[in-house]
Amino acid sequence: MNIRSNPDTTRPAVTTGALPSSQKIYVTPDAAPDLRVPLREIILSKEAAEPNLPVYDTTGPYTDPAITIDVNAGLKRPRTQWVLERGGVEQYQGREIKPIDNGNVSGEHAAAAFKAYHQPLRGVGDSPITQYEFARKGIITKEMIYVATRENLGRKQQLERAEAALADGESFGAAIPAFITPEFVRDEIARGRAIIPANINHGELEPMIIGRNFLTKINANIGNSAVTSSVEEEVDKMVWAIRWGADTVMDLSTGRNIHTTREWILRNAPIPIGTVPIYQALEKCDGDPVKLTWELYKDTLIEQCEQGVDYFTIHAGVRLAYIHLTANRVTGIVSRGGSIMAKWCLAHHQESFLYTHFDEICDLMRKYDVSFSLGDGLRPGSIADANDRAQFAELETLGELTKIAWDKGCQVMIEGPGHVPLHKIKINMDKQLKECGEAPFYTLGPLTTDIAPGYDHITSGIGAAMIGWFGCAMLCYVTPKEHLGLPDRNDVKVGVITYKIAAHASDLAKGHPAAQLRDDAVSRARFDFRWQDQFNLGLDPDTAKAFHDETLPKDAHKVAHFCSMCGPKFCSMKITQDVRDYAAGLGDNEKAALYPAGHVGMTISGVIEDGMAQMSAKFRDMGEELYLDAEKVKESNRALS
């Protein structure tokens, strides 16, 4: 159930407790008996006569009744020990937190600082630090074992049945094995086709993997602005987003208290946290892009690396030479980071410092294993601008930068559009795979039409499902508030559920060997009128039950063999069940009266097959002519009867 923790003992208050009819379970992998990998088990009714269903779980300790949540203290940090055991790192006194890090806020406007402080770690020497470096050296890390276990969903015994059901999936070149092994994970990371975003300073993290040969992931954006929101609201939104299935969360804060907000989020986040560092750097120079400097930006990167941010969106592909390509666009440059860098380039008439200092950025991020999310600063902001030269020029540059980052030992994924009509989506996926060496693709939607403000979670969910099918590894959610305002708690939930649908639809279409198991479980519950199971197996049990209860609220209605859509007399599933029950109860004499002579005891398919054989013989007996005399046909029919 949903429990709002007491704000007197936990600040801020967050939602805890298990989802309806669910329990947290842990799997211990053979390769690392000391690991406990979380899954959510959906408990089915006794009437189901089938095992409970394990599903992927992003909720962290917030749904484990055995763990006491104290937001002030933050989550436990078991991953820190994994990092220390591997060696190659040092603990050091991090940079001093300065007033400018929080926008020089003071007095009543200053948010309370997070009390606990952990000295940061950084890599030293030539020893491998990043998951990419370990993978390239043939070393399987605990993070790799952990994500392999998560991806299998604890369903090894059921995979044979799932594979047979999904033999018709179209993977478009993805190669998803029946069972994910740690070695497969290592190989995918070594090839650059997958990443485990996991800063060595994010000890609270439960590792996850992003790549097209794994489950399609989703990201939820949160963050305050200069206009609205607070630390409390953003931490609550983070916990709320992962409750409904967000695999990663990006903190896109742009107002005051940016450092403090991020610290509260990270210390309570069991999932990877991403940021766009240029936003905070801009706040440090009073919001004027012209005043940005490489030194200021670098200091911001170090600040966020030490805090534990797992991936950075860096718009290093917005080059001076590409800006003029956006001049004839309907909506110009719509990316905040892209527009900031474009203005800086034009004001100084210089190449972007993100591009010219890219090698140095790689060296810095490698020390902390912060993954690149190479930003699409020139993405199309309208259907009219989709797939134009500006967009693809930047993508080609991102491909060049990807190879540099790999050479430096860094993990990389690529951000994509945006606003793209259905018929132009596949070329985006194909070009990204070609230009960027199959590095994971991470897209915002794309939105497939521009006519539905207030419903852009739907316009984008359509495109997200399609590009996920084509091979996109992670989908960034869009909420109903897109283009209209900062999303609130309910908008976050709607956005996450919409994108969980899109991601799951993608996995089904690709032929992921475990995807259909949940669909089949829902379908069986639906046909058997197990209403509670149907609710609980869904992505949003609360909403499903609430809709049902609007018209049939009584407990007795939860066992009724109909709903308010068709009523008891016109329910197709009940009629089908009645026909089956009737057929099963027939005696031999009754069956003989219903079946043609010689067919008693045969299945329906057998009767049909026998009848088809008779008609084939009849066609040959009558000379194999297409058009026959009617009287001859009547005579032949009388002979058969």
From Swiss-Prot:
Keywords: 4Fe-4S, Iron, Iron-sulfur, Lyase, Metal-binding, S-adenosyl-L-methionine, Thiamine biosynthesis, Zinc. Zn(2+) binds at H419, H483. GO terms for biological process: thiamine biosynthetic process; thiamine diphosphate biosynthetic process. It catalyses: 5-amino-1-(5-phospho-beta-D-ribosyl)imidazole + S-adenosyl-L-methionine = 4-amino-2-methyl-5-(phosphooxymethyl)pyrimidine + CO + 5'-deoxyadenosine + formate + L-methionine + 3 H(+). GO terms for cellular component: cytosol. The keyword ATP-binding does not apply. [4Fe-4S] cluster binds at C563, C566, C571. Its EC number is 4.1.99.17. Transmembrane segments: none annotated. InterPro entries: ThiC, ThiC-associated_dom, ThiC/Bza_core_dom, ThiC/BzaA/B. Substrate binds at N221, M250, Y279, H315, S335, R336, G337, D376, G377, L378, R379, E415, Y442. Binds 1 [4Fe-4S] cluster per subunit. The cluster is coordinated with 3 cysteines and an exchangeable S-adenosyl-L-methionine. It comes from the Bacteria. One of its GO terms (molecular function) is carbon-carbon lyase activity. It holds the Pfam family ThiC_Rad_SAM. Pathway: Cofactor biosynthesis; thiamine diphosphate biosynthesis. Its cofactor is [4Fe-4S] cluster. Homodimer. Catalyzes the synthesis of the hydroxymethylpyrimidine phosphate (HMP-P) moiety of thiamine from aminoimidazole ribotide (AIR) in a radical S-adenosyl-L-methionine (SAM)-dependent reaction. Belongs to the ThiC family. This is Phosphomethylpyrimidine synthase. It comes from Rhodopseudomonas palustris (strain BisA53). The gene is thiC.
